[in-house]
Amino acid sequence: MALNNRERITRAFDLLQEGLHDLVDEVMTRYFHTSDWPERMSAQDAQRYGRERRRLEKTDPQVQLRAITEYGREFSRELSRGQQSLASELRDTRNEWAHGAAFNSDDTSRALDTIERLLRAVNSMDSANDVRKLREDLQRTVYEDRTRKRSKPTNTASISASKGLKP
């Protein structure tokens, strides 16, 4: 059964989470000097914004993308600024996805392409290849839909001049 755009993005974010986990965990553990860095990050948020601590998970792509964008200097050995900007774009995409936004084919294709690029940047080739397959499937579906719309038979009526009428 064909996937819809939301399902494609959901699968891609699952693959992104897997692909980013090791790098983000390593860098953030080094920065916070503890493997429980999400707790430290949450404590900083609570202090900075004057609110209750929130439970953050290492495996949440929102937390991983936020780590890359907000602690960019810590990732500078692993990711260039351009590659880090992919994470910034994906934060917006992830927020739209989390809030139930609809994704057209162009937006979906861009999101899948950006996820694939970020996965390649962190050398998560298997996940990147899986995302590429999702994008290729989307492209195939779009092409088939457009071809089907163009080739639908149209009803035409032939009109011929009646005898006896002058042109």
Model-derived regions, located:
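Amphipathic alpha-helical interface elements
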Residues: 1-167
